[in-house]
Amino acid sequence: RELKYIFITHLHPDHYLGLEVIKSYYPDARVIAYQKAADDINDAYDFKIDYWGNTVLKSNGANIKFSVEKWQQDEITLEGEQIKILGLLCGDCTDIAALWLEKSRTLIASDLVFADCHVWIADMRTPEILKNWFKTLDTLEALEPLRVIPGHSSAALTLHPCAISFTLQYINDFIRELKRSKDAAQLVATMDRLYPDYPIRICLEYSAKILKDRYVWPGDWPLSLRHLASGY
C-alpha cells in the first residue's frame, strides 16, 4: 500500500523521533500535524534531537530532522473514509490532536489516554492545567467509542474504551498520593504498590521528581516549563 501521510499528534519526541525509519521505507509520505501542533513540533525538534539523540541515547538516538507540515483541515480522508480531527486537546501535554473514525467508533487518542501503564503527569504543573485533561477525558467518554487506541499501553493492548477511565483513576491516585507523600521516593513507592509491575516506569519517576521534589529537568520543553513550579 502507498503511505500518504504520517500524522504526528503532538510535540513529545517519542511520537516523531522515529521518523527516520518510517521515511526510509516511505520517502514520499507527507509528515503532517494539526495546526499549532505542527509549530510546536518544528520548534521543539532541534532541542529534542540534541537532548535525546545526542545526550541521552547517543549513537542510538535520532539525528535527522524532518519538516512537519501544518494541516489546517478538520479531517483527513483515508481510503474513502473521513477521519475527524478532534481539535487540540489537553492530555499529558497541551495541544494534542486525537482522531475519530465515526463509522467504526474508533478513537485514536494519542497521549490523551494511557492503558495499564504509568502515566506521564509531569507537564501538569498546576491543578488548573490538570483540570483541562479531566475535561478532555469527559469529552472522549461522551463519544462512546467502541475502540480506543491509547498513546501508551502495556504489551497486552486491548483497545478497550476502559482505558479512558483507567487514565482518570491513575491521575487521581497520583495526585492524592502526591499530596500525602513527603518526597518523590515515597510517592513512587506508594504508586508501585497501587500499580505493581506496570510498564513505562520513566513516567512515574520523572512525574514524581518534577512535581514533588521540584526537579528542574533539562529535557523539559517548552523551556517555560522549567520556570513553572509545581502547584501541588
Task: Mark where each language-model region is.
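Loop/turn elements at helix/coil->beta-strand transitions in domains of secreted/extracellular proteins
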Residues: 2-4, 27-30, 81-82, 103, ...
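Active-site HxH/HxHxD metal-binding segment of metal-dependent hydrolases
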Residues: 2-77
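A mature extracytoplasmic/lumenal domain signature
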Residues: 7-12, 35-37, 82, 89, ...
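Extracellular/periplasmic catalytic domains that process cell-envelope and extracellular macromolecules
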Residues: 24-25, 76-79, 91-92, 100
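Accessory terminal helices/loops
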Residues: 40, 51, 142-147, 155-232
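Beta-strand-turn-beta hairpins that frame and shape the catalytic cleft
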Residues: 75-84, 101-107
